[in-house]
């Protein structure tokens, strides 16, 4: 029992000492805040003021029209894509969705590539991108 009480008393003294040392007195905290304020190089008066401007209906309509023009021009640009000329088919090639294991020749479709699954046991020519 005496050993248990001695350990508890030691623990209590240690906790009291730890809490007393970990919290600074209130006077030091105020001095630190003042020194931080005086040492700070950024001053709020250095920044320009911000003004808030209300939009009228006319400005909103113009921005909507401009946005619609941009959208339509982007759509037209995507529609006007020129089809790339296809390379001539070489005689030894693999058709799309057929097996193309590594000793086999390349895929016939220029937009297709050989994809292998299950540790290269099942390979087939597949078209990856629709925009090609």
Swiss-Prot record:
It is found in: Secreted. GO terms for molecular function: melanocortin receptor binding; neuropeptide hormone activity. InterPro entries: Agouti, Agouti_dom, Agouti_dom_sf. Keywords: Disulfide bond, Glycoprotein, Knottin, Secreted, Signal. Disulfide bonds join 93-108, 100-114, 107-125, 111-132, 116-123. It holds the Pfam family Agouti. GO terms for cellular component: extracellular space. GO terms for biological process: hormone-mediated signaling pathway; melanin biosynthetic process; melanosome organization. This is Agouti-signaling protein. It comes from Macaca nigrescens. The lineage of its organism: Eukaryota, Metazoa, Chordata, Craniata, Vertebrata. The gene is ASIP.
